[in-house]
Amino acid sequence: MVYPGPPGLIAGLLLAALSLSCVDGAKALGFVGHGYNLTVSQGHEAKLNCSLQGIEEPEIQWLKDGVPVQSADQMYIPVDEDHWISFLSLKNVERPDAGKYWCEAEHSGRKSVSDAIWIMVEGVPYFTLEPKDLSVTPNSPFNMTCAAVGPPEPLVIIWWVGDSPLGKSESSPSVLQMSGIHERTAFSCEAHNAKGVSSSRTAIVEVKGLPYPPFNVTISKVTGSTATVTWFPGFNSFSLIKSCTIQVQSLHGNREMYSRLISAPPFAVLLDELQPLTNHSVRVQCTNEMGASPFTEWRTFHTKETVPQLLPQNVHMTKTETSLLLDWEEVEPDREGYNILGFKVQWEQENATQGELFVQENQANLTKWNPEKDLTIRICIANAAGCGPWSEFLLAGSKEEAGKQRHPHTRMSWVPMVLGILTALVTVVAMTLIFLRKGRKETRFGNMLGSMLGRGGPVIQFTAARSFNRRGPEMMEATLDSIGISEELKSKLKDVLIQQQQFTLGRTLGKGEFGSVREAQLKMEDDTMQKVAVKMLKAEIFCSSDIEEFLREAAFMKEFDHPNVCKLIGVSLRSRTKGRLPVPMVILPFMKHGDLHTFLLMSRIGEEPITLPVQTLVRFMIDICSGMEYLSSKNFIHRDLATRNCMLNEDMTVCVADFGLSKKIYSGDYYRQGCASKLPVKWLALESLADNVYTVHSDVWAFGVTLWEIATLGQTPYAGVENSEIYSYLIAGNRLKQPLDCLDELYEMMCQCWITEPKRRPSFVDLKQRLEAIWGRLSILSASQDQLYVNLGETCGAAAAVSGLHSAFCSEEDYCAGPSQTCGTSAITSDYRYIVNPGCLREGNEWSSSAQNGEARGLLHEEEEEEEEEMQEEQVVITL
């Protein structure tokens, strides 16, 4: 049987096979071996195995906490005909992976279950309870709570008040009891265990006070007697506003005032029972649990004029032979603010003729009327707004018989007749259109079918929309013209286009939300092969605009030529089936040591942590600063500078990379973001957060955050602060704390990068000079001290401290240098970036991790990993 596998594993299987061959007879179905506990560091790999005997070609299922494990990293191999071993590999273990694992197999209705394997995941502390924002009354006691868990245990909690630690450490959970504060104070906590430290979010405790006065008092919808008042509440001083008081004052007559108390919100009120045509003033105050705010300034408004709400009183009528005299009680012209102009008199007689008369006095004389007919009269008081309510009708009888009945005029209604005619017309037109359309269809298809039947052909013919065959779909030719990008971008990329046949894709190096990076072998002009990295978009998520944005990054990189800036090798297009856009690929140099953030993080919390000298960290900073100095000189702004976007070359040189958000400045010195993009909020400058403005000065801010990342060996900036809270946190004057053991001069440089005014920040030229001065002083200081000698003459285990350092800083040529593989003595001098080869490396099988104990390999043994991976790719024939 042929299967791939490392020599160590193959040898173990051979021994197991030999031992099993000594057992006579058939074996009963069942798992062999015992369960065990496995402790794995967060972010590393765990390998599990179980052994089953008594069945040929079994189906072995892995379960975690009773749920089947859905993972592609499972395999099982035979030891002999009825003995199998199943392997489960968990890459990049996280806390949810902790739990109970076991194997199950079923045959002929009988189920067999293996012993359990318990996985415990260790990492930096994880907060289960973080400090919360509070609002407290002045000088009143309150508590803050913080809790975190491991493993590993134990862990301790240290409280910070502002930028100062309280000094004492407590076990988790920890309750901080405060007797009271009188001003705004920030609280946070740190959790420490053997794997490192985690920082909680920063909780802000505010002190309650009186609310500020309301503002933007607005009067709207004003009528003669009502008005709507709205306002915005002032700052509530961290105590909810419960009610508001509105005072209204009439500026007419005695200037009376009244107040109304309303619950809030809403912050609006309808004022009623106002006097018409009158000036009024209004002001507002609001109240919280601490008391009332000051009143606003008086706001004046004028009510409109309304029709008089008065009736004429004591109307008298005097009838003569030729006229009818009316009189009523006088009314003051400005009574109740109505500004009365006069009176309106209306009358009507039996024959429906009407008359109207306007008089200014409190009397009227009607002469144009027929005394032989009945007369009805009514009166109202009028002003400029209109007529008020009418008085009751007065009846002046005629001389004819009083009880004569009047018949109303009958009018013929034409509405039903018109509606009937229109309905009939619409029905006729609709039916006509339906018959005409049906006739056209019958004629068209009738001719077609008739001609075919006349020739003896088929009644129905059709053309296939799609054909199917076994040769697979045709491929669309992948060219720059086929992806729909601009002519300007085509011209920039034409000379760096590489045909897909010139390189071979290999393993995946990393994946992101929108794409992936894969290792590849590129065939050069001299027929040699060069290892490269290929960055490509995910095939299922892009359109033409996505391709253009992706390739624009390549166009930027084409213009770069600097040792600390990632250089473009070329671009390529991967053909796909016809009708689908090609997959764009950007070909970049292969960076052996990956990104700087992962390197720093693994040096701190890896399986075998190493201590990076300060000189090395400062050298990283200088490399990044040199790259950014070059970009700024080319009028480029990066907009996404961070350690995750800085790559480590084979000789540990740092290169600035990932220009997906970069922009070239063609005029002026700033670029304004015009659309919504996913932006690195915690690395953005204040002006970028506020106004979407990006300049070289905003890149300097991000460089300061990058320096902080390097000094903390990859910690997350503003840990515990949500992205939505970053702007408020920074505008309040807060900045990142000084890292432990960080040089004061370095932290001062970071703080200068975070100055609020952009033009007061230092340039990359100044920053590079200052960093080189620091590095020079550190090198002189180290050179003045004795050289550090490490005795490598005993076991290689004594050299563990330097072997990791060597693996991290030596190139492949240095790694293999030296005539002997025996242990010797190594001198480490002032330049910690290049270390003399210690000449003592264990064999790959000594460094490889055991599948049973689940130890993940560390970052510092990358060479051994690559050798083992190459061996695993070979096929080995085992004869049992």
Curated annotation (Swiss-Prot):
Residue(s) carrying Phosphotyrosine: Y671
Enzyme's top EC category: transferase
Sites where a glycan is attached: N37, N49, N143, N216, N279, N351, N365
Spans within the Cytoplasmic topological domain: 436-880
Residues annotated as binding ATP: L509, G510, K511, G512, E513, F514, G515, S516, V517, K535
Highest taxon, organism lineage: Eukaryota
Keyword Disulfide bond annotated: yes
Protein known as: Tyrosine-protein kinase receptor TYRO3
Organism: Xenopus laevis
Lineage: Eukaryota, Metazoa, Chordata, Craniata, Vertebrata
